[in-house]
Each structure stands twice: as C-alpha cells, then as structure tokens.
Design a protein with these regions (language model features):
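Helix-start/capping segments and mature chain N-termini
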Residues: 1-17, 21, 35, 41-187
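Ordered, amphipathic secondary-structure segments that act as subunit-interaction surfaces
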Residues: 24-34
Length: 187
C-alpha cells in the first residue's frame, strides 16, 4: 500500500493552485494520484509522489427527465480474489471501462455489474441505489463496490431526513421491480 506524505490541507492547497492555473469555465473532475516511481519496479521504495489532473467535464446530459437506459453487463465486477475492489486505484477502473464500452456498443447508457455471487454490485465508476416501496436500498461494501464518500453521504442524509435505508444484497430481479434506480458518484 501507499501512505500519503501529504496532509489533507496540502492536497487541498495543491488542487486550488492547479485549478487557478488552468482557468476552467466548466465543471471539472479532479484526479489526485499518488505513485511511487523509480528503479526497482514493483518493489521500489522511493518516496511517494503526487500529481493532480484536472479534467473538464461539461454536463451536456444533465436533463434526466426521461431517464437513462441501463443493462446487466456480461462483465463481472472484480472481487477480492483478484484485486481489492474497495481500493480507489486506476487499475480497478479498467473492469468498469469494459462494462461501460459494452453498454455503449449495445445502445445503453450505463452498465450494471454483478458480483461473483450474481448479486448487484455497481455501475462503471458509480455506486447504484434503488428506491423500492419508499426504501432507499444499496448493495453493501462486500458486493465488490468501491467504497464511496458520495454513497455514504447519501445514506447519512437519508437517515437524517428520516428516510428508511437498507444496505443489503440486491438480486438483479429486484432492479426490474424498483420504483427508481439511480447512480451516484463524485464525478
């Protein structure tokens, strides 16, 4: 694992400097990446470095009145037997990319990936939540999802406003019975 030598305030300050230097006039996704480089390849013990990549993300599809079309992907979500899915590392997103490209090639807007047990996991780069009979339901961390600050915030806000929430395994058949399905993520 990599331990950050940077404090949260140092990272925040660096992000602000990068944003000011680039003068964006649209929504921006900020990728903060920690890495180790140098001789020794995988076993390198050189200092941890950081780079910040601001990526313009214009929101042309913000009008969601008619909804979006999702599909159950043929790509299984990675699991702890191969790579820890809870880790926010670049390599873990390749699995989601394949699922997304498959969905796009079949004229769907997004994939829904299942875990090793055939239970609902997540979409590509987004956690999945559903409303069913007034209850907000989302798969647990053990369903091969990326642990998400946004997902946790939505669960906390739902509880704060006295909405019933359930974090539990979700069968794919339940998606067809849901009142609403939505994706959540930071970018």
């Amino acid at each position: 694992s990599i331990t950050s030598p940077y404090t949260p305030s140092e990272i925040t300050e660096a992000i602000i400097k990068v944003l000011h230097a680039n003068t964006f006039r649209c929504d921006v996704s900020i990728r903060v990446t920690l890495f180790v480089d140098g001789e020794g390849g995988w076993s390198s013990s050189n200092p941890v470095n950081m780079f910040i990549a601001p990526i313009a993300k214009p929101r042309s599809d913000i009008n969601l009145e008619n909804g979006k079309k999702g599909m159950i992907s043929s790509f299984e979500r990675i699991n702890d037997h191969s790579m820890p899915p809870r880790a926010k590392v670049g390599a873990n997103y390749i699995n989601s990319r394949y699922a997304y490209l498959e969905a796009q090639s079949l004229s769907f807007d997004f994939p829904i990936m299942l875990d090793r047990m055939g239970k609902v996991s997540e979409s590509s780069g987004s956690c999945l939540m559903m409303l069913r009979d007034g209850v907000l339901v989302t798969p647990p961390n053990t369903a091969s999802i990326v642990e998400s600050i946004t997902r946790n915030t939505l669960l906390e806000l739902s509880k704060k406003f006295n909405h019933t929430t359930e974090v539990r395994s979700v069968d794919k058949a339940e998606l067809y019975l849901a009142d609403e399905i939505f994706l959540c993520g930071t970018s």
